[in-house]
Each structure stands twice: as C-alpha cells, then as structure tokens.
Regions:
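Short, structured helix-loop element that forms part of the nucleotide-activated donor/catalytic region
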Residues: 230-256, 267-271, 343
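Short hydrophobic beta-strand element within catalytic cores of glycosyltransferases
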Residues: 300-303
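Conserved donor-binding/catalytic core segment of Leloir-type glycosyltransferases
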Residues: 4, 160, 193-221, 232
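N-terminal subdomain of nucleotide-sugar transferases
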Residues: 1-52
Length: 379
C-alpha cells in the first residue's frame, strides 16, 4: 500500500529553518515509527513550508519525505488553498492509495480533502471546541480553524477519532469514524524510572487556562509548603497573558515549584525517569500524549476525568482520575500517590502493560492500515 501522510514540519512552525532534519508532532512521529517497522508499505510524508530547507529524501527505508515550499499568500490568508493546490500536484505524481491528513489546526486537513484521492483525517485538537471556549481571545485563529474543520469533516471519507469524546463531536458531520488512540514514541517504552527521593510531580503541557496549572498549584499548596513534594512544569505559554502572570507569581511565592519550559523529547524522557507521578489537571483534552507517554514510561499517571481521558485510564487499575473543578480531589489524589508506594507500583505496572498492548507504534500503525483498507473497500 502506498500512503501519503500530511503533517506539519515543526521546523517551519518554530522558525528552525536551520535544522536539516524535520521533526513532527509527537503523535504523527510515533505513527511513522510504527510504519517504519512494516517494510511492505510505502509512506510519503509531505510537509508544506514557507521557506526552503535542507531535508533528507528518506526518514526510513520505506518512508519518503517531501518538503514543499509554498509562498506566504498560500497559507492562512487563502484558507490554505495555496498549500492544498501545491500538495495536490505532488500527490498526483506520487499516486497513492490513500491520503491521511494529520490535524485540523493548520493546512493538513484542507490538503487531504482537496487531494482528489481517498482520504481520512485525524483530529488532534478539536478546533470547534477551542473556538466555543473563546480561547486566544482577540484572535480570529480558532474561529477560522473551526470553520475549516467543519468544512473538512464534511468532505473527507472518514475520521480517525483518537477518543470517544472526539468521535461524539464529529460523527454527525462526517461519513464514518474509527476509534483509535495515538501511538507513543518508542523511546518512552525504554525508560527505567528512578524517582527523586523527594516526590517529584511532573506536569507536561501549555501554561494556560485549559491545562489548569494554576489550579494544580493552588490545590497542592499545603503539600508543597509542608515539603511533601515538588512540581516540575514542562511547557510554555503566553508571557503577556494575565494567566501567565498569575502562574509566575505563584512560581515565585510557593516553594517546591520548577519551570522547565518547552523541552526536547529526550529531556522529557529524563523527566519521566525522575518523576514520582505524572499529573494532568486539564479542563478539556482529546487524547493527551502525556498520559500515554507516562504510562509507557512506567510512571503512575493521574488525570482529569474529562474529554478522552476515560478512554485511556481505567480508574484505580492503570491510573487515577479526578474532577479538575474540585481542588480537594486533585490534592487527595496526589496525596494518595506520594504516600502509598504500593499503590504507585501497582498502577505504574498496569499502566505500562496497557501502553505496550494499546499504544505501541507498530500496533497503532497496523490498525491504521486496517482503516485505510476499509476506506478503499467502500469505494
């Protein structure tokens, strides 16, 4: 089978045009790792860029890479039509069996549905939900992304829903859905945890209202002041926002807090190794990678009972869940984990087994092939 994967090259997104090798979002990257283990498939990764960059022709023996430069006018101002048309011309030359657009945040979904080939989309962030929550106030980004998401949902052959939450959001708009979680980068399965002597809680995510880091600090303040734990925050945010300023004020006034900023995947692996537990107090999420990655790394995971999280965690079996609106539940969950080593060990072991069984890259890649075959068989 010949497959086109449309995904964002984060060199372009982050302004790292000097790098000579592409890097992608954690979920698409892990999926490509899985495809690399299936030699009888041919994968072509296409990423649009606003500047020319040096790039390898192949990412693996069976995975080709195409960096496609598109002029500035072909991006958001044209509703990504320039990206879609340039990609369409290249896809015709490749002549794939199927096209897979990764995400509705930017250009990839439009490129897939306008490709002229059988196609599916994966919804990573639900743009219509973000727009309804009025995130990034003062910006039209989410409103535009939500409108394009709706258009693409109606035009695609189907959606790979990475959670039941997303399936329920899109199933009335799109012809077909398949429920399949993200894959996890294989490096996290190799971690051997060695937690710090003082319990270290790891938060991974954007420093903003939706992920709720301020709520986490306030809930845990008694534990932090009693020197029962520390919290490390791996992520960044809008330093001009009121939320960031409140977060920074707490960072300066409450003991035991550390801001790591945005860190590499290798550095994140080291943080998993040191962590006593991983916490995600989010108010809304689809298939949060930190939950999957923490489980793969063999670290106990506690997360909000919202969005797609209940698909990933079996409460009291391979993780713990809580209500993010109730600070006492966040605090009680963390207290249980930092004080009960037997509980941590049991949940970490079960979580790791779940990750190997359900989130390993090769397993997820093979299930994607089944989805592609479903699409082709229905034509």
């Amino acid at each position: 089978m010949r497959i086109v994967q449309l995904t964002t090259d984060n060199r372009n997104q982050h302004g790292r045009w000097d790098l000579e090798h592409p890097y992608f979002g954690t979920a698409p990257e892990a999926l490509l790792q899985g495809f690399a283990e299936i030699p009888d498939v041919e994968v072509h990764v296409i990423s649009c860029t606003s500047r020319p960059m040096k790039s390898p022709e192949k990412l693996a023996p069976n995975i080709h890479f195409h960096s496609l430069r598109v002029p500035k006018l072909g991006w958001g101002r044209s509703l990504f039509l320039g990206c879609a048309m340039a990609t369409r011309r290249l896809i015709r030359k490749i002549n794939p069996d199927i096209v897979h657009g990764q995400g509705t945040e930017r250009d990839c979904a439009m490129e897939a549905v306008l490709s002229g080939y059988p196609n599916v989309l994966t919804i990573h962030g639900n743009m219509r939900v973000h727009a309804s929550r009025e995130e990034q106030k003062g910006s039209s980004y989410y409103k535009m992304a939500a409108a394009l998401e709706t258009l693409c949902l109606k035009r695609t052959n189907g959606v790979v829903a990475i959670s039941t939450y997303t399936r329920e959001l899109v199933e009335k708009l799109t012809p077909r859905t398949w429920l399949l979680p993200n894959a996890v980068d294989r490096r996290y399965f190799k971690i051997e945890p060695a937690p710090d002597p003082l319990p270290r809680i790891l938060f991974v995510g954007a420093i903003g209202e939706r992920k709720n880091p301020v709520g986490l600090i306030k809930a845990c303040e008694p534990l932090l002041r009693a020197r029962e734990c520390t919290i490390a925050f791996a992520g960044d945010g809008d330093e001009n926002s009121a939320y960031w300023k409140e977060f920074k004020s707490l960072l300066d006034s409450v003991p035991g807090l550390e801001l790591l900023g945005f860190i590499s995947r290798d550095a994140l692996g080291e943080e998993f190794r040191r962590a006593t537990l991983v916490i995600l107090p989010t108010f809304e999420d689809n298939c949060p990678m930190v939950v999957l990655e923490g489980m793969a790394a063999g670290v106990p995971v506690a997360a909000s009972r919202v969005g797609g999280v209940p698909d990933l965690i079996r409460h009291e079996v391979d993780g713990l869940m809580f209500d993010p609106e109730k600070p006492e539940q966040i605090r009680d969950t963390i207290t249980r984990l930092i004080r009960d080593k037997e509980l941590r060990t049991r949940i970490a072991r079960a979580g790791n087994e779940t990750a190997w069984r359900q989130f390993h890259p090769k397993i997820i890649a093979e299930k994607h092939l089944g989805i592609y075959q479903d699409v082709l068989a229905a034509r």
